[in-house]
Each structure stands twice: as C-alpha cells, then as structure tokens.
C-alpha cells in the first residue's frame, strides 16, 4: 500500500506500508523471513480503527504512532496471533476516519470480511533499506520479495499477473531476434 505522502520516521502509519492478515500465527514468521528478511523474533504492530481499540486492548489509550505496548485482551489473543508479542502485548496504531479515511475504510472492510478490523502494519522496506519512496522503489521491492499484491494509488498489481505478463513479454520479444 503506497497511497499519499511519505511519512517521516521509522514507522509506517498506513502509507508506504506492508499490510497482512494477523489472523494466522505463522504470518509473523512469513513476513520476517520471506518479505522483510530479518530476525524471526521481531514482532509486528497491529493497526485498527480507534473505535475498536477497547475490543482488543484493556489498558492504554489511542496510539497514533505505534510507540507503546499494551496487553491484548486474553480473549482476543488467539484471534489475532500475528500481532501478539510473546508477553501478550502489542504496539497498536489506532486509526481515525478523519485523519486517514482510506486506511480506516480498509480496516473496516477487512473487519467485515474477517470479523476483526485489524491488520499487521509494517514499513514497506526490507532489512537494510529505507522505506520505499517512489512507485519504482515500491515495484522493485514488490517484485523481489514474496509480497502478493501492491497498491499504488488506485491501482492494484497482483504478483501472479506480473509474473504471467513478464513471461508473455519474453515470448513476444523472441520474435524480434537480431540478425
């Protein structure tokens, strides 16, 4: 997901983000190994609509910047295991509709489909590289990692489609062999 202006700092707050379902326990490992290329112990943060915060967290308050860790409600830990740290906490980002309407709407839509309006949200980069800045950066990272899809503004690119098109392009270009 690469909508809007580039944010500052080390956190991806809905722009230049890699988003994934937190519903699978192994999603954290998959993202760390196959996408981010970093240590397996490193956790991911949940983004959720501010109005759903108390459903998942007993303590704390709104957290726009993924700075503080709070205990995840015991009854929710198995529902969103991809964002729960080993100590039962998570470092949430609360999203307000007035501050980030598209990201808020995406979280709500995911909630309607999955029952949980929560997504793993991590910076759109791999270990040792800065967060993507341009569409070309985003496309390069997408092509060279195990990401399934890339959203650039109003465009959706699917990895399988991109691979198929690359193969078709190679076949097409073979007809123009040099003499």
Question: What are the residue ranges of the model-derived segments?
Answer:
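Flexible beta->alpha loop and helix N-cap segments adjacent to enzyme active/binding sites
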Residues: 1-179
